[in-house]
Amino acid sequence: MASEQEILSGLAEIVNEETGLPTDSVLADKSFTDDLDIDSLSMMTIVVNAEEKFSVRIPDEDVKNLRTVGDAVAYISQAQG
């Protein structure tokens, strides 16, 4: 099971691969849409990659609740058990 810091680092790498944003700009308090300018298609790619990386399932209906990077970190941490 990954720590929240490891999850944050992993998500930053995934966001970097998808968008080209520097990993150090992907912080827990950043909004995916407002701060990082990630559209819904890119968000779905990020979710799929996060599911694979962290061995979790994030149902489509839960994705809309992941507004910030921190929301995603908390969700993945909880989903890992």
UniProtKB/Swiss-Prot annotation:
Organism listed in the record: Kineococcus radiotolerans (strain ATCC BAA-149 / DSM 14245 / SRS30216)
GO molecular function terms attached to this record: acyl binding; acyl carrier activity
GO biological process, one term: lipid A biosynthetic process
Function text: Carrier of the growing fatty acid chain in fatty acid biosynthesis.
Annotated positions of the O-(pantetheine 4'-phosphoryl)serine modification: 40
Pathway(s) annotated for this protein in UniProt: Lipid metabolism; fatty acid biosynthesis
Localization in the cell: Cytoplasm
InterPro entries: ACP (IPR003231), ACP-like_sf (IPR036736), PP-bd_ACP (IPR009081)
UniProt keyword Lipid biosynthesis present: yes
Protein name: Acyl carrier protein
